[in-house]
C-alpha cells in the first residue's frame, strides 16, 4: 500500500503545489456534470436524459436504543425490554415519516443496524440505527426529522427503553442554475433527445 501523496508523486504530480490547481474566478462560464442517474426514474419513464434542477442534501444521524440484555429462554415476553423490537418500530417510523413527505422529494433510509450482544439466545440489549434522510426542500426534511424525534420519544416511553439521537451531518440542498437548465432543455429538443425535469437524490460535485 502507498499513501495518496506517494501515488500523486508517482503519477508526476507535485502535492505541495495543490493550491495552484484552483480555477481562477472569471476563467470559466459554468460547470456541467454528466452523470448516470444512479436510480430508476429515467428507465421506468423511458426518458433518455434528466435535466436536474436541485441536488438533495443528506442529514445523517444515529439512533441509539438501550434496553436490557436477558436470556432468551428464561425471560418471559412481558418482562422484556428488547432493544431490537423497539428499533424495528423506529425503522418503520423513519419509513413512514419519509412516505408522508415523498411528494416533496424527501426520502429516509436505515442502512445499518448494529445489534448487541448479537447472540441468538440473548434478548438484544442495545441497538444502533444509522439513518440517512435527504431531500431538496429544507422544510420537508425538517418535518421528516421532527416526526422521527416524536416517534423516538413515544417508543422510549411505551417500551421502557432509552432512545438517543446522535447527529452526524446536516447538509443543505442546492438549487442549480435555471438558465443552464433551460439551455439544456433547448439542446435536448434540438437534438431530439427525450428528457425529464427532475431532482438529483445523489450528491454531485459540479
Residue ranges and their predicted role:
Residues 143-153:
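Short amphipathic alpha-helices in soluble, non-transmembrane regions
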Residues 166-206:
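An extended, acidic, His-containing surface patch that forms the Zn2+-binding/catalytic region
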Residues 122, 140-144, 196-198:
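Extended hydrophobic-aromatic, low-complexity segments
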Residues 157-167:
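Conserved short beta-strand edge segments in small beta-sheet-based binding/regulatory domains
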Residues 48, 149, 179-182:
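Charged helix-capping and loop-helix junction motifs
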Residues 112, 133-135, 145, 167-169, ...:
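Active-site proximal loops enriched in glycine and acidic residues that flank catalytic Cys/His/Asp
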